[in-house]
Amino acid sequence: MANNTLHRYLFEDLSVRGELVQLDDAYQQIISSKEYPKPVQNLLGELLVATTLLTATLKFEGSITLQLQGDGPVSLAVINGDNNQKVRGVARFEGDIAEDATLHQLMGRGYLVITITPKDGERYQGVVALEGENLAQCFEGYFERSEQLKTRLWLRLGEYEGKPHAAGMLLQVMPDGTGSENDFEHLEQLTDTIKNEELFGLPAEDVLYRLYNQDKVQLFEPQDVEFFCGCSRERSGGAIVTIDRAEVDDIIKTEGKISLHCDYCGTSYDFDSIDVANLFEQATSGNDTVH
């Protein structure tokens, strides 16, 4: 049974909030769009889990894009998610990548770009150097500098029942200032004991009971996480008519068709000479109507 859910919870007596995300299909769809080496799959998985955890903090309609850029074998890895937990992602890489490649071996000298885009309002963008030993530490550093809130992330990737899974947890001190450092460290130590198979295979309620049965935990309604690309034949056609007609005709003459490929979901859209003629005719008639 597919398990793609985000759970928010609150420690009632400790002024600490938490999140738990468990992903299978949503993660599998992202990494199946290309033949990614295992370390790149894992990198996308960690970025996906982090994006899902961060979008849960949005207090408005909008989206968060997490983008890794570097001069290593992986030049780009990006995940986009919105407040409805619709996610998509892609990575670009070159050359051979070792099975045990670390974050810094994958990205080289790189940085993390965090872009928050409200539906209404100004966009915010933060840039963080990849200074931590792993991606979780990079995000923890971001929270410490940008929000001054103690935050811990756990990002887990692995196989469960023969399929790739991704999961993660987040703990964060509430901004009311009443939480103690000892309380937070206590919860960190408990969360450190979680095993991958528990995160991948147990219901959220069981995970939280397994970790925090001595604490009062309020669990909120779950939110589904869904892979959503948004590409379509219509959008691809709209992109074609922005290209010079002579250039499009040259491609049709040489290739017999013009193809647009979606990096996010792997779908290809093919247009032959008749399709292209119709596209430009519709675009021209549309412009005439406007004028």
Curated annotation (Swiss-Prot):
Subcellular location per the Swiss-Prot or TrEMBL entry: Cytoplasm
N-terminal signal peptide: none
Disulfide bond sites: C229-C231, C262-C265
Keywords: Chaperone, Cytoplasm, Disulfide bond, Redox-active center, Zinc
Entry superkingdom: Bacteria
Chief subcellular location: cytoplasm
InterPro entries, A to Z: Heat_shock_Hsp33, Heat_shock_Hsp33_C, Heat_shock_Hsp33_N, Hsp33_helix_hairpin_bin_dom_sf
UniProt PTM comment: Under oxidizing conditions two disulfide bonds are formed involving the reactive cysteines. Under reducing conditions zinc is bound to the reactive cysteines and the protein is inactive.
Cross-referenced NCBIfam families: PRK00114.1
Protein name per Swiss-Prot or TrEMBL: 33 kDa chaperonin
Organism: Aliivibrio fischeri (strain ATCC 700601 / ES114)
